A protein has these predicted regions:
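Helix-to-loop junction immediately C-terminal to a conserved catalytic motif
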Residues: 71
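Conserved ABC transporter NBD signature motif
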Residues: 79-93
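Conserved ABC ATPase "signature" region
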Residues: 126-141
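Catalytic Walker B motif of ABC-type/P-loop ATPase nucleotide-binding domains
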Residues: 170-173
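H-loop/switch region of ABC-family ATPase nucleotide-binding domains
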Residues: 205-206
Length: 250
């Protein structure tokens, strides 16, 4: 426990930068009942293009439920989700968003990486797919079956798909699960690439190092309620650190 405390205390945020763009995504009074239980309770937030927002909280806090609701997989919610001032129903949210699950293997369907990058896309841009694979260092594996790739390569494949699929909102569930430190830093760098493309990015994670390396903002959920929402600046790092230290002591 003490070793973890020292290590966490030394990590510094390296992705933080003020985002001066106008918010394009708005969540207003979002609530959701699941099996007669209130699992999301009056959430309100906005996000601008290029933001990388870490979603933190203990198990059962509502992180995954919020993510699935945001991308249209939960439909029985109240409140509003708007994109550029226009309210989105569940079907529209599906069109706007792309979610990468914790185990990427379950959403790799094509028989080659090259085909995976354009899978399910009408009129795909093959040049864009090639450029994405080249940019992410996986072009040499384009003829390989996606499930033969390493964990880090699969994550890069998922990022390549997110670059090609023309979605505005990207949601990642534990993207560094099972990755070593070097691979985690590589994934953090890939998120910076997506940020520069103007994507709105949400990341559900329990990885303190990844939050510090990749995210510009943190939203803390607990029992379906929004507890904190803050920029991940050096001045706010203690808030993130305190959350993880409390979690370790539970």
């Amino acid at each position: 426990m003490a070793t973890s405390f020292i290590f966490v205390a030394k990590v510094q945020p390296i992705a933080f930068a003020e985002n001066s763009q106008k918010p394009i995504l708005e969540v207003r009074n979002l609530s959701l009942f699941y099996k007669k239980k209130l699992v999301l309770d009056d959430l309100n937030l906005s996000a601008a293009p290029g933001e990388i927002i870490g979603i933190i909280g203990h198990n059962g806090a509502g992180k995954s439920t919020f993510s699935r609701t945001l991308c249209g997989l939960h439909i029985n919610c109240t409140g509003q989700i708007l994109w550029d001032g226009k309210e989105l129903n569940a079907k529209s949210r599906l069109k706007h968003s792309y979610m990468v699950m914790q185990d990427v293997s379950y959403q790799l369907f094509a028989d080659t990486l090259e085909k995976e990058c354009v899978f399910g896309i009408k009129h795909p841009d093959l040049d864009a797919a090639k450029q994405a694979m080249e940019r992410l260092g996986i072009y040499e594996y384009r003829t390989h079956h996606p499930n033969t790739l390493s964990g880090g390569q699969k994550q890069r494949a998922a990022v390549a798909v997110s670059m090609v699929c023309r979605k505005d909102v990207l949601i990642f569930d534990e993207p560094t699960s099972g990755l070593d430190y070097d691979s985690m830093i590589q994934v953090a760098g890939l998120f910076q690439t997506l940020s520069k493309m103007g994507k709105v990015i949400f990341v559900v994670t329990h990885d303190y190092e990844f939050l510090a390396a990749a995210c510009t903002r943190v939203i803390h959920l607990d029992n379906g309620k929004q507890q904190e929402d803050y920029l991940l600046s050096p001045d706010n790092l203690h808030r993130l650190r305190d959350f993880f230290l409390r979690s370790e002591r539970r």
